[in-house]
Amino acid sequence: MPQHIAASDLRLTWPGAISTEMTDDRVMPWRIPYVERNLFAKELVEKAAMPAGVRIRFQSNTSSIEGFCNSFPERSQVDLLIDGGYVASAVTQNKTTFRFEDLGSATKTVELWLPQVGEFRFEGMNIDVSAELSEASTNASPKWITYGSSITHCSGADSPTTTWPAIVARTRGYDLTCLGFGGQCHLDPLIARVIRDREADLISLCLGINIYGGESLSPRTFGPGIIGFVKIVREKHPTTPIALLSPIFSPGREDTSNAVG
């Protein structure tokens, strides 16, 4: 019989998650404070339920991992990293289990990068019957928070480690918190509060395309909206570098006014 590790086991950490919701034997990572989700726009809540950039992290000498989760119709893969290196991906769409084998018996830091698309409720995992498991050492990497639209959410990427925030974080050695919300980057003050209240060494904000497409801010309110958002973040990050980015080039939008200008 394998050794079962409960989803709520405190030796498992959840880097990249803003909060975790525990129900029965499941843990669902959120990218907003889930207890306050009724305060957020419902469209944003839907995207925040997708664990882009969230990892389950632990240390073990197990040679196999069998994970359990809810079934979900449209969901990307789980990626396995060992000691920071990519090992394999597992399909999770319409599945309740995923498995990785032949991992060797050495003690290693394991990271399960969760799907950037689709709701994911973790229901625990099986490891080798005699394997040891402990909390991984504290990640001392610089902490990076990135906020943006679908450009940052990267729902079209093949797997969670092939999104551009994941590639940058792994290449540069950053501890990633991804707040990319497809179609929902509208300078919500509640998101500014989330960023404000989270530890960060670098913050990047990619702004504009959803505001243009959704016509949510006008020439009168766009600039003040950015300033207000940054001012909220600065309340607890007075000296943290903040990079303000425009979206990637978008033909058809560059010289065309929307309904609010």
Residue ranges and their predicted role:
Residues 85, 103, 110-182, 189-199:
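Serine-esterase "nucleophile elbow" of acetyl-processing enzymes
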Residues 61-63, 172-174, 238:
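Short glycine/proline-enriched coil/turn segments at helix->beta-strand junctions
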Residues 174, 181-184, 208, 247:
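An acidic- and aromatic-residue-enriched active-site/binding cleft used to recognize and process polar
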Residues 1-143:
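N-terminal secretory targeting modules
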Residues 67, 147-148, 245:
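Short hydrophobic segments within beta-strands
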Residues 43-46, 180-184:
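Short, flexible loop segments at the rims of nucleotide/cofactor-binding pockets, characterized by
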Residues 86, 152, 184, 211, ...:
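Surface-exposed, flexible loop/turn segments at secondary-structure boundaries
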Residues 49, 53, 189-261:
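Alpha-helical cap/lid subdomain in secreted, periplasmic
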